[in-house]
A protein has these predicted regions:
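Intrinsically disordered, low-complexity, charged terminal extensions of DNA damage-control enzymes
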Residues: 1-36, 41
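Catalytic cores of DNA base-excision repair glycosylases
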Residues: 24-174
Length: 174
């Protein structure tokens, strides 16, 4: 079997597994009406960014309710920038690792400078390169890759703990 064939086989099997077992209910990966986006369709970079930072060292089932409350209080980047740090930390209460909330708040201010307050809903104004995202506090390569691939449907690598675990199982490494 050629190497390219084995890659195609791995991709096929992973996509089939996800179709049967994946989390299809995650609100930041759905359209506003709750439907699944088409391939190539952009989702909210803001909503995905907040979710990805919340998901750092926290399970999805815990993040879901916090993310929904966050989006009610800070529905846009501008709402987040206009909030004071105390308010941001109050909404983070219970998630732990409060430095993540502080970094989100700092990053929001930097993103507004980069994007401009008039362009927050224009996905073409948001960063789409890993090197741009990792300049923001609290964003590493895996988080940046996940934001870019989810929000902009671009093929960028994500090598987080889950991906490493899958590869380890595939090649029998402990």
């Amino acid at each position: 079997m050629e190497f390219a064939d084995s890659i195609d086989n791995i991709q096929f099997n992973l996509l089939n597994w996800f179709a049967s077992n994946g989390r299809h209910f995650i609100p930041w990966k759905l359209r506003n009406d709750g439907s699944i986006p088409d391939q190539g369709e952009f989702l909210s970079p803001y909503e995905i960014w907040i979710a990805e930072v919340m998901l750092q060292q926290t399970q999805v089932k815990v993040v879901l309710s916090y993310w929904e409350k966050w989006m009610l209080s800070f529905p846009t980047l501008i709402h987040l920038v206009e909030a004071d740090e105390h308010e941001v930390l109050m909404h983070w209460q219970g998630l732990g690792y409060y430095s993540r909330a502080k970094r989100i708040h700092q990053s929001a201010k930097l993103l507004i400078e980069h994007i401009g307050s008039d362009n927050i809903f224009d996905t073409s104004c948001w960063p789409i390169e890993i090197d741009q995202w990792i300049q923001l506090p609290g964003i590493g390569k895996s988080t940046a890759g996940s934001i870019i691939s989810s929000a902009f449907d671009l093929p960028v690598p994500i090598l987080d703990g889950n991906v490493k675990r899958i590869f380890s199982r595939m090649v029998s490494i402990e």
